From Swiss-Prot:
Natural source organism: Bradyrhizobium diazoefficiens (strain JCM 10833 / BCRC 13528 / IAM 13628 / NBRC 14792 / USDA 110)
Highest taxon, organism lineage: Bacteria
Gene name as annotated: ctaB
Listed CDD domains: PT_UbiA_Cox10
Family statement drawn from the similarity comment of this UniProt entry: Belongs to the UbiA prenyltransferase family. Protoheme IX farnesyltransferase subfamily.
Compartment annotation: Cell inner membrane
InterPro entries, sorted: Protohaem_IX_farnesylTrfase (IPR006369), UbiA_prenyltransferase (IPR000537), UbiA_prenylTrfase_CS (IPR030470), UbiA_sf (IPR044878)
GO cellular component, one term: plasma membrane
Function: Converts heme B (protoheme IX) to heme O by substitution of the vinyl group on carbon 2 of heme B porphyrin ring with a hydroxyethyl farnesyl side group.
Membrane-crossing segments per the record: 31-51, 52-72, 119-139, 152-172, 179-199, 225-245, 247-267, 284-304
Pfam families: UbiA
Keywords: Cell inner membrane, Cell membrane, Heme biosynthesis, Membrane, Transferase, Transmembrane, Transmembrane helix
Membrane topology: Multi-pass membrane protein
Name of the protein in its database record: Protoheme IX farnesyltransferase
C-alpha cells in the first residue's frame, strides 16, 4: 500500500480536541532550533548590509518553513509513528490531531512562509525554501524513507539547505561559502542518524523503515559511520583550508572532529550489544554538540570580524 493509499485509509472526519502545545509539537521545535541556528550562520556570513527587519523576517520564514515540513512529515507518517516507541507520543498517534488537520496546518504554513519570503525578501530565497520543503516532504518522506536504506544520505540534503536559503535571502545568489555549510551538514547527517538507527533498530524494524542497520546489518553501518565521519572532518576543515576562516576555526573544527572520530572508532570496535548501545548513544549525543559548536565557532568569527574595525576605531 502506498503512502497516499495509507493516508486515505487513515483519514478520520472527526474534529480533534487539540491544544496549542499539540500544534507546536507538529513543528518539531528541536529540529527548528537547529534550522534557525544554521540559517543564522549562513545569513551572518553573507556579504553586504541586510536590514534587521528583513533578517528577522527571513529567519522566521525559514523557521516556519521547517515547521511546515515537520507537520507534513507527521501527517504522512502517522502510521509509522504509531508503531515506534520514540514517536508514539506525537500528537497524531495519540489522537490529539487528525492527519487531515496536520496536513492542512502544514500546507498553510508552507504556503505563507514561501510567499512571505519571496515577496518581502527575494524570490531566489523563496524558491530555495519551496524546494527545501518539497524535497523533505515529497522526496524524503513519501519516497526515500520507505524505500531505500540510503534515505538519510540523500534526504539529508533537505536539512542542509537552510544556510543556503539564508545566504540567498541576503545576496539573492548562491556562492561557495553557503555550499560549504551545506556540505558540512550533509556529511554530518549520516553518522548522526545511523547512530540513532543502531540503538533504535528494533523500532525502525517494527515500523518497516529500511534503515541501514536493518538492511545491511550493524557491522556495515558501523563502517559507514566511520567513513562518513572521516569525510566530515575533512569537509568541516574546508572553510579554513580554503581561506574563508582563520586558524581558530580550523583548530576548533579539528578538535571537534577528533572527538567525533574517537567516538566513531569506538562504535566500530564495540560489537557486544550492551557496549555497542552505549557507544552509539554517546556518538549520537556528541554529534549534536559537534554541529552546534562548529557553527557557533563560525558565527563567533563572523561577529569578531564585524566588531574588530569598530574596536580599532575606538
Amino acid at each position: 500500500m502506498s503512502v497516499l493509499d495509507q493516508n486515505a485509509v487513515d483519514i478520520n472526519p472527526r474534529i480533534s480536541e487539540a491544544e496549542v502545545g499539540d500544534y507546536i509539537a507538529l513543528l518539531k521545535p528541536r529540529v527548528m532550533s537547529l534550522v534557525i541556528f544554521t540559517a543564522l550562520v549562513g545569513m551572518a556570513m553573507a556579504p553586504g548590509h541586510f536590514h534587521p527587519v528583513l533578517a528577522i523576517t527571513s529567519l522566521l520564514c525559514i523557521a516556519v518553513g521547517a515547521g511546515a515540513s515537520g507537520a507534513l512529515n507527521m501527517a504522512l507518517e502517522g502510521d509509522i509513528d504509531a508503531k515506534m516507541s520514540r514517536t508514539a507520543n506525537r500528537p497524531i498517534p495519540r489522537g490529539r490531531i487528525t492527519r487531515p488537520e496536520a496536513m492542512t496546518f502544514g500546507m498553510t504554513l508552507a504556503f505563507f512562509s514561501v510567499m512571505t519570503l519571496g515577496i518581502l525578501v527575494n524570490w531566489i530565497a523563496g524558491a530555495l525554501l519551496a524546494f527545501t520543503i518539497f524535497f523533505y516532504v515529497v522526496i524524503y518522506t513519501m519516497w526515500l524513507k520507505r524505500w531505500t536504506a540510503q534515505n538519510i544520505v540523500i534526504g539529508g540534503a533537505a536539512g542542509a539547505l537552510p544556510p543556503v536559503v539564508a545566504w540567498a535571502a541576503v545576496t539573492g545568489t548562491v556562492d561557495v561559502e553557503p555550499l560549504l555549510l551545506f556540505a558540512i551538514i550533509f556529511f554530518w547527517t549520516p553518522p548522526h542518524f545511523w547512530a540513532l538507527a543502531l540503538f533504535r533498530s528494533d523500532d525502525y524494524a517494527r515500523a518497516g523503515i529500511p534503515m541501514l542497520p536493518n538492511v545491511a546489518g550493524p557491522d556495515a553501518t558501523r563502517l559507514q559511520i566511520l567513513l562518513y565521519t572521516i569525510v566530515l572532518i575533512a569537509v568541516a576543515a574546508a572553510p579554513w583550508a580554503l581561506g574563508y576562516f582563520d586558524a581558530v576555526y580550523g583548530v576548533v573544527s579539528l578538535i571537534l572532529g577528533a572527538g567525533m572520530l574517537v567516538l566513531a572508532i569506538n562504535v566500530y570496535m564495540r560489537r557486544e550489544r550492551s557496549q555497542s548501545l552505549r557507544a552509539t548513544r554517546k556518538l549520537f549525543a556528541f554529534s549534536i554538540l559537534y554541529l552546534f559548536a562548529l557553527f557557533a565557532t563560525l558565527l563567533a568569527e563572523v561577529v569578531f570580524r564585524a566588531l574588530a574595525p569598530m574596536a580599532g576605531g575606538a
